[in-house]
């Protein structure tokens, strides 16, 4: 109900929606109905993430809201994120069919491997596996995600190890007085999924629950003309859930406690090769604001992970296989993070904080030859880290100057590698404890001009410490064996970027461009030691240096009220500069990094009908360090259309890989390919 005696303009805003401005005539007395339209990409690009550490450089952020998640056509969150420029997983794989160890994330061409070179946060808590750095994307219930922000570019000055290529910050839904959202779908390849999110407030207290059950029969990874008796569909069955208890701490603060659980069982494409994972997590956090003291945030978290996997050797004709290794990888982590931020007048903002983490894990293996046990192998260790950071941002008229840095110190201890053969003497090795330190500074400058133009420039250093998986765990994919290396050193990056953004035509058109350059010393790569038709042997080693440089271009346009189109282009030149141990690798392309990536999104949104499509082109890349195993270029399109049958119920149909492109996923050297056309139909229910 609105009552006014004079003419005026009423502005209403809500997260995820465009601000509505309505002219209110004089002498208005009665109800006023206002409809909020979903926020455009133009607005979303400029939204600062919930974690205040993420810098507000407009040329390097990409945001995805709940509406776009629904319109993407993708079932898993990693496939939704592929619309972000530079986002990629190891071996082009996805959460529906990939082994967990190949779901490490990379941004901006720094090179993908099993261990992510980007940090993934869920409400400020790291989501990367503490043991291996990869991400279990199916831990995230679709309907419980409010938004995702992707920051391209090194951010170790704020986040330390893991943020070598950038940060992905995922925010869950905000708890309201009472709500329940449910999505259920079913499709071909025996695929079905149900996701839900709900909660209720009781005075100052609140409780929220979220969960997801996903199952797919999957598809056969090997091309039809190369299949044998051992080849089966690569499917998965996942179950995840969480319960969150929250309490308001006065008008300016809140605290929460979240308990989560995740279970997954996968078939990896042959009769013998399977894996399963069990994860529990406990997160405790509090946020509090005070006009005089500033904003405070604290997180305390812990988790345990059990990852089990079988490896096999497949005959050349793929008619038989034999078990070679059965692994069990238990790991645990505990960590904390504290952050403080305060504005000084209207022209300065300072922030500081510290965080620490303790990770323990090992790989217990049973090796086989001709179905007989040959040895018991166990290797693992412990990694403790502590970091302190600070940042100062000063505004002078239309200039913004930011400088800061972070100091990290970590220690690898209790490292061991034991082998007890059935025949022969045991080998027991203890590794010397090692400590490393990294300083990660950053300087940034932003200039905002009239008419919606802004330019930015940044220079920085970053690092990534090797994971316990890289240090101590061996693995096998196809006929490729990759050995661990306990002597690995931290990767260290030096880089910079410059960017320009333009917002015009009444905020309906947004253009941006970014030039970036980075050099990574001691980059960890899988280096080929020997190659035969039956077996390729590799080891994780520190390369001398690699260089990644390129161009990012983005354009977004909203027109005719309901339509929006967007496109992104990433050109990356990522090459090996120096490797004294093997000069033949110098000048070659970094594995798993395509030179060209093009994305586009189209959406139509109105009260009843909604439609969205996203396309992706990826150019040729190589699967190996010697550039002898190419993966050819491909183009694919995902889409979704939905219709609201009432205010609370919406029906939808979703398609993945509409082009039917069986693009190449990996070459080990056996070729594996991507999924066929995937179709789902389902319903979304929202009760509020």
Task: State each model region's role.
Residues 246-262, 278-423, 430-431, 446, ...:
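Face-selective signature of the C-terminal outer-membrane beta-barrel domain
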Residues 296-311, 362, 448, 454-460, ...:
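Membrane-embedded beta-barrel scaffold of Gram-negative outer-membrane proteins
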Residues 157, 169, 177-179, 183-185, ...:
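Periplasmic-side early beta-strands and strand-to-turn transitions of outer-membrane beta-barrels
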Residues 395-401, 410, 510-512, 516-520, ...:
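Gram-negative outer-membrane beta-barrel transporters
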Residues 13-18, 27-71, 78, 513:
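Short, acidic, small-residue-rich periplasmic hinge/interaction motif at the N-terminus
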Residues 78-129:
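Extracytoplasmic beta-strand/coil segments of soluble accessory domains associated
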Residues 2, 125-152, 173:
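Short acidic/polar hinge/loop motifs at secondary-structure boundaries
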Residues 199, 247, 457, 491-496, ...:
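Conserved C-terminal beta-signal and adjacent last beta-strands/turns
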